[in-house]
């Protein structure tokens, strides 16, 4: 390198050094504190370029949040986290279907809320090789097959220490039966009772017998007069219920009243009069009514006493053989179908009706052919012959048409010699007449 070039380079360095002095080292520790947060390392403070501190300067102190973070980093068994498994950590992002569905948003009207109807998703947990299929209704559910907890609660939880009696073995209490609860899940109060049941009590602490069960309180002893029972015949009054009855007399040692004759029960129609010398319960008319035309028989009663005539037979008429002209009774509810219909409308095995018959069997009283001109097959002079005598018989024969011939283009046929000159037609016998149908 040439000497002048070296001199120019050294001169340039000096100019730049004089123009921009070094201020980095001078402003390095101008902060009122000795050091910032980046110089804190655990409990020690790393000082660089230490100098005499100002009057109110002090070392930054660690806060409660810093202690909580340091304590959470330690792996101590007796300091667990609430709602967190020490070996399973919650994954912040889902691998499958991470965004909420639209119908969930419309139903909840909240952007990121996932309630009981959330959809399934795959989660990964450190320490577990396989993926856990999370499909539980609650946010902090468990897998049904692996029984692995989903993770810690998303909200922040404060640290807590185990109680002092956690290390002691707890006594296992026997399974108890659920107590009956009242309103608002409160205990139902029970009346105090002795531990040993009495001689007259059953297993349910109730007194034996229907009398004691009806009473709330146990029976108490009372004074009873000699000769008066507690519940005897004198307790009830005589007579029927609902009617005024005399007061009953006390049952004592005295003699009972003499027995009277049994009461005679009369028929309903004879309650106002004297009883008749006839057997009980035999009556001619129901409830003692009068004999009327439908109930009584015609004529006087038979003079000779005897049994009553059977129902529907006369006692004065003897039994005779059946008469030949007697009409046989038939079933009134039977359905006889066609043979009981009107004779005028139904005709069995009859021929066809003529064209001019007023009854066309349609239950309409109109003529079959009111106007003959409406039919093209009937000539104009046909109505003139309708007034003559009609002859019942078969329909008149229609003249047979001639067979068609295989005509050529020149108009001659292929038939015999009598058809060579062309197709000939026989003269018509007369006008066509419509016959009976």
UniProtKB/Swiss-Prot annotation:
Comp. bias (Basic and acidic residues): 119-132, 143-164, 198-209, 217-253
Compositional bias of kind Basic residues? 1-29, 81-91, 101-118, 133-142, 165-190, 284-293, 324-348
- Intrachain S-S bonds: none
**Record's compositionally biased regions (Low complexity):** 371-382
User: Could you tell me which residues belong to the region Disordered?
Assistant: 1-31, 77-437
Highest taxon listed in the record's lineage: Archaea
The molecule here is called Uncharacterized 50.6 kDa protein in the 5'region of gyrA and gyrB
